[in-house]
Amino acid sequence: MKKIGLFGGTFDPIHNGHLHIARAFADEIGLDAVVFLPTGGPYHKDAASASAADRLAMVELATAEDARFAVSDCDIVREGATYTFDTVQIFRQQFPSAQLWWLMGSDSLMKLHTWKKWQMLVRETNIAVAMRQGDSLHQTPRELHAWLGKSLQDGSVRILSAPMHNVSSTEIRRAGVSDGIPPAAARYIREHGLYEK
């Protein structure tokens, strides 16, 4: 059975931490592919500072060297807010017999019960969680306790041994884009004058 990992994010910009956790995701779960899904209009984040087209181009450039990585614009071309459940449905239709895995950080796990159709989502896809420094499963909201306990036991939720890097795209933009960005994406940023102060 084919195993496909889905990795959504604003990727504004994509950085080495994203690539590191995507490789760990692929290695630890034994994925055939990791599909990066730059968001169009995420309902739970502030507007991105680079256009969707620029973010898509940067992700394509940054992921080109790993044959396991693919990029989809499905969340960009959809009109309106994009929800994870809808994205997973698109991949479920394209790959009906594949085992789907959704990658999220522990910060997202703590808010999962607020996501649109979260209970249906977790029936459609397995979840891989990258823990952020300082986060603990003991902090999980009460609304998720029963589901998380069962899911950790049956293997439909896996905690990755590789931690999330404590660097964010926001910090990279504030500090000035240079370190921590894959070279091809950094070149694109310079050539297109993105994130200039």
Curated annotation (Swiss-Prot):
Enzyme class per UniProt: transferase
HAMAP family documented for this protein: NaMN_adenylyltr
Quick one: a GO biological-process term for this protein?
A: NAD biosynthetic process
User: Would the keyword Nucleotidyltransferase turn up in this protein's UniProt record?
Assistant: yes
Q: Which UniProt keywords apply?
A: ATP-binding, NAD, Nucleotide-binding, Nucleotidyltransferase, Pyridine nucleotide biosynthesis, Transferase
Its annotated function is as follows: Catalyzes the reversible adenylation of nicotinate mononucleotide (NaMN) to nicotinic acid adenine dinucleotide (NaAD).
In the Enzyme Commission scheme, what number(s) does this protein have? 2.7.7.18
Name assigned to this protein? Probable nicotinate-nucleotide adenylyltransferase
Q: In which pathway does it act?
A: Cofactor biosynthesis; NAD(+) biosynthesis; deamido-NAD(+) from nicotinate D-ribonucleotide: step 1/1
Q: Which reaction does it catalyse?
A: nicotinate beta-D-ribonucleotide + ATP + H(+) = deamido-NAD(+) + diphosphate
**One function term, GO molecular function aspect:** ATP binding
Pfam families under this entry?
Answer: CTP_transf_like
User: Can the keyword Cell membrane be found in this entry's annotation?
Assistant: no
Q: Which family does it belong to?
A: Belongs to the NadD family.
